[in-house]
Amino acid sequence: MQKITYLESPIFIEGYSAVGGREEARGPLGKYFDLTDEKDLFGMKTYERAEGEMSRLALNLALKKRKITEKELDLIVAGDLQNQCVASSGGLFTFGVPFLGLYGACSTCTEGLIVLSAMLTSSRTYKRGACVTSSHNCAAERQFRTPLEYGAQRSPTSGWTATASGAFILSKERTSNIMITSFMPGKAIDGYIKDASNMGAAMALSAFDSIDTFFKENDPDTFDLILTGDLGRVGSAILRDLLSEKNESFGRKLSTLHNDCGLLLYDLSKQDVHAGGSGCGCSASVLSSFILPKVETGELRKVLLLSTGALMNTSSICQGDHILGISPLVTVEYGGT
């Protein structure tokens, strides 16, 4: 049975920052990023190390913006798309803070917010922690698809893995106007898709399942935005069809509230990103660069975030397995007066 956790005492998002690469800087949200690099290397020699450096820079910026030192962090939870989360561990070990590595594919941002919120809520030991998520286009292409030098043609349904990182400082204390008030882990759902270049379609069913479950207990009229992670053009269309098939008026209402980080991060009419943005850095960077500032000022008062993940690896794809989707969610609210 899937259960929603409603926090009696909210967890506050005290600080946040976003770091991105060349395509992210050229997109419509580029001006909202704290730092971007036209070379996508961030001073490193390899793209894999560059992803770790993005995580380090994002967390460092989030701390500096709030004048917090790393010694004031009790825990870091972080994840990325590289095997064994080496980008996160390699980029964040210098902070000298206890570390939990997470892997939820492109759902890692929301997964991290859930894990850290739960630990802060239930523990007397932890009072403040950081959640960091990253992905790098070139590192992901090399690991999951083909070497960059090969120049393989991409399918129209494929997404563009974001070169981006988002960092969030969470606290038990009321240190900001941004609150996490509820969360729900996702279920692994068979998307009945085997094509790794059509992950938006593979994840759409899990997004529908989480949204449908959540709104059995909650009123959509109280929300300003339902934000999925990286369904892109294809997955978003499927999600809206699924919602309408369930209940036409209900689906129409939710469709008016829905947007997708993969559609916000890039200008699909001008940038060659095919179906839109993807990667766990996609939802993390859109949340930290564009959404949270609006929540902090009260422009957005209640947002439902579902970072959508496609659970697969190169072996499962080569063996013809179905891609499972997962969509954990968190509710972020304005806590001002």
Predicted regions and their residues:
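Condensing-enzyme catalytic core mediating Claisen C-C bond formation in acyl metabolism
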Residues: M1-E48, P147-E217, R252-L263, S269-D272, ...
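Conserved beta-ketoacyl condensing-enzyme motif
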Residues: I13, E48-C106, D221-A237, L242
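Short beta-strand segments
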Residues: E14, A78-G79, G129-S135, V303-T308
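Short glycine-enriched loops at secondary-structure junctions
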Residues: V19, A78-Q84, S135-H136, T175, ...
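Short acidic, glycine/serine/threonine-rich loops at helix termini
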Residues: E24-R26, A87-S89, A140-T146, A237-L239, ...
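Short, well-ordered amphipathic alpha-helical segments that serve as non-catalytic structural scaffolds
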Residues: E51-K67, V115, A202-E217, V286-P293
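Short, well-ordered, mixed-charge alpha-helical segments that flank or form enzyme active sites
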Residues: C85-V86, N137-R142, K187-Y192, G235, ...
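Active-site-proximal alpha-helical scaffold in enzymes
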Residues: Y103-V132, L170, S278-E299
